[in-house]
């Protein structure tokens, strides 16, 4: 069995392509089932977000499995197989494990160290598990990856430093006010950066937010989407008299907030602080306003300095997390190597205990007068003899797990003790056959 990961992400495909290869939430369960029923696939998890669509699979053969996954994606999104090959990257074995660990911990995200992907991986795994497309390997591996990512974030604080301009804008406001929950905010503009700033303000606890824009319809649309207030741009001077935070991001060719405007409203504001954050280029807010008492004016260069410093902190944290990944891969490989040994040890124990049970039956027939206490003593000691006899063979079997010729030697081990253990590959195939029948039955029932 082999682990393979096929990924379409922000490095391999531009946004125009990624938009075309995203599974809708309501289609993911069926997609899991369709892929699972495909030849060569023994286990699978599908991850689909705005920045990546990935298939993780346990396959019986690498080349066959890779082809059928690529064909599945091509059919799902209306592409040719060669198109999918061109827009994706393929990881196999240890590289696939490393990829999963990096994705889950946010090291492979557009925003380094972001935590949203951890929840998305967890949801994808839980969906696959509930659908029935995971088995022994993925049930262990994905739990390991999720645990690793949680620990990495807790130990390094990689997600604690803002690395987007809109998020950094809110962080600057926090430096002035501390908690923002009771503050009033104005968003000038209704584009993408304005919406991101609005979302970050909402995330900080602020609820009193007003969107203003030259085109009132756009302000109305953005405000309705996030359930905040809106107003005309001409109302800005009046709004500034009671505002605490202003974030401006428009494409205006002249200043929207001028020195004269701020000087006029400053008289009515008494000594209340006002934070003006200009993330527009060209600038929306006239330079020099910071000279007015209790007025804090920041532009994109101020934000860039904060973002750059925070990014360096995240990169240091990412390096620390990356150093831990080889240990996780080794732990996974150790666990995998034991999969072939466990059934052999189980078969050996079962045979030994069957011999002990036969021996006790023989003793019962030949010594029918034994008391229950005497019988328990004999049973206990015969089991003890068996455990002592099995101690060294079991130890040897475990050591075979790390041997390059473990399969051959485990087969010899079984021949010596005249036992027969089912290999993990056969178990996985039988498990798949059973689950495919369940999926088919579920679909028939759903159709009826």
Curated annotation (Swiss-Prot):
Q: Which GO terms describe its molecular function?
A: glutamyl-tRNA reductase activity; NADP binding
| Annotated NADP(+) binding sites | 189-194
A GO biological process of this protein is: protoporphyrinogen IX biosynthetic process
Active site (UniProt): 50 (nucleophile)
The record, for InterPro entries, names:
4pyrrol_synth_GluRdtase, 4pyrrol_synth_GluRdtase_dimer, 4pyrrol_synth_GluRdtase_N, GluRdtase_CS, GluRdtase_dimer_dom_sf, GluRdtase_N_sf, NAD(P)-bd_dom_sf, Shikm_DH/Glu-tRNA_Rdtase
Superkingdom as given in the UniProt entry: Bacteria
Residues given in the record as substrate binding sites: 49-52, 109, 114-116, 120
Among HAMAP family, the record links this protein to:
Glu_tRNA_reductase (MF_00087)
Its assembly, as annotated, is:
Homodimer.
Q: What else is known?
A: During catalysis, the active site Cys acts as a nucleophile attacking the alpha-carbonyl group of tRNA-bound glutamate with the formation of a thioester intermediate between enzyme and glutamate, and the concomitant release of tRNA(Glu). The thioester intermediate is finally reduced by direct hydride transfer from NADPH, to form the product GSA.
User: What is the protein named?
Assistant: Glutamyl-tRNA reductase
